[in-house]
Amino acid sequence: RRLRFYNSGTIDDLECVIQHAVKTESYKEIVLTGFSMGGNLSLLYLGNKGSQVDSKIGRSVVFSAPCDLKASTQELAKFKNKIYMKRFLVALHQKIRAKMKLMPGQINDDDYHLIKNFKDYDDRYTAPLHGFKSAEDYWDKCSSNRFIPEIKIPTLIVNARNDPFIADGCYPVRETSDSKCVYLEMPESGGHVGFIQFKKDKSYWSEERAIEFLKS
């Protein structure tokens, strides 16, 4: 039992899962597919690994990745996203309360109602529980955008232009422009992990695009 939670920088957890898969299963190839927070995490992992990434990891596809955590946090704090922010904070509060039962006296939710956005939450919980100086320090160190140039396997990033959760900093045009491995696509629609298309088989455009990229 540990106080830590899943967050945008827990690449050690991802590494543990990957190594377990490599050592215990007979996969010919492993593909990293990430959505939203998991997309940022996948990019952060691959960028940190660079040329040292396990040889079985052949490709990666991510959708709606908040590559710039500060920019995404500021976007979510806007009034237009109030309903989303409230739902996120309610869900996080439930996780805090569950941890309080598991580890009484080590964490509390006193005055939790004063937390209004991710900056408040990250300053109070994420940063101190995971060794960061502040929310700003956490965002800076765990944003994947500056690690993208170090990715050495074919990787597709798809961030819709109408995604309500991500801002300009989350469209890594500059970081991908000179890369021979990372490709950025910015479709006009798709929202945040939406990419719905009205087909009889009920398939998502994102599913079809991912398969297309992996087969290319």
What residues fall within each predicted segment?
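Active-site nucleophile elbow and catalytic-triad environment of alpha/beta-hydrolase enzymes
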Residues: 124-147
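Acidic beta-to-alpha connecting loop that harbors the catalytic carboxylate
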Residues: 145, 161-164, 189-191
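Alpha/beta-hydrolase active-site loop
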Residues: 4-25, 44
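Short beta-strand/loop motif that positions the catalytic acidic residue
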Residues: 151, 157-159, 163
